[in-house]
């Protein structure tokens, strides 16, 4: 069931694209899921001059500056020549440049993404790339969310960019909508749980503290403790031996059964086999629509919910 008021609030929270241009204000428009610790340090980042007149565009570019632990992160949307007209207004399809430091040393300098490099075959003219203002950060990785949307609509795709401390970059597909079209926070949270958990586990040297932070964000205390002991070779949540992070491209989250507070997820392995799991959800205290993952059990294709209006 799509809840209209909640849906609008969720889209505003997830796809918001307006942030103060003032550098002092920028520090207050960031709310990391793990509290930031500011430290005194020499200036690592010197901002490049941008002489573009942004007043001609419908939406102003976002800038993010934040410090978390020994991470220092700077992100800048900027105009790189891509624009289009929508409803008589000019929209820029901004690119984003990242400068990321860890322990006082550069990890990514001038790393650039745009809608073509991030969306690949899903690139569509007339859509614009929006940068999420809140980053999720662990000791080993910085996760940046993007909404790729048709202006003034909820016709959007989502991507997550993982910038890892070892210098590797990974791109993940997520969604705010279930396979049946339900838009709800539980869908987003399950996608992000799988994305962050799998990314952390698949690093060359997984970090226990990073994994714990991710699990504590999205799971109940008891289930987080269970998953903390798991690996990619054998994992209760993932359900396949030697899970490959690229399999997440096919991940689907299905409509929640409100009687049991469970939903089915599935993905396709490289050998073509479909894997189904039933995710158990527990309502967060003092909330109406927010859930934590409390468990997982095996499922089959027969457990999938019926598609609305007889769709297949």
Segments predicted by a language model, with ranges:
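Acidic, glycine-rich flexible loop segments
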Residues: 117-158, 163-164, 241-271
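Residue-level signal for glycine
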Residues: 101-107, 167, 271-273
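Alpha-helical oligomerization segments
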Residues: 159-178
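Short, solvent-exposed aromatic-acidic interface loops
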Residues: 112-117, 175-178, 295-304
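Short, surface-exposed coil-to-beta transition loops
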Residues: 93-95, 154-159, 273-280
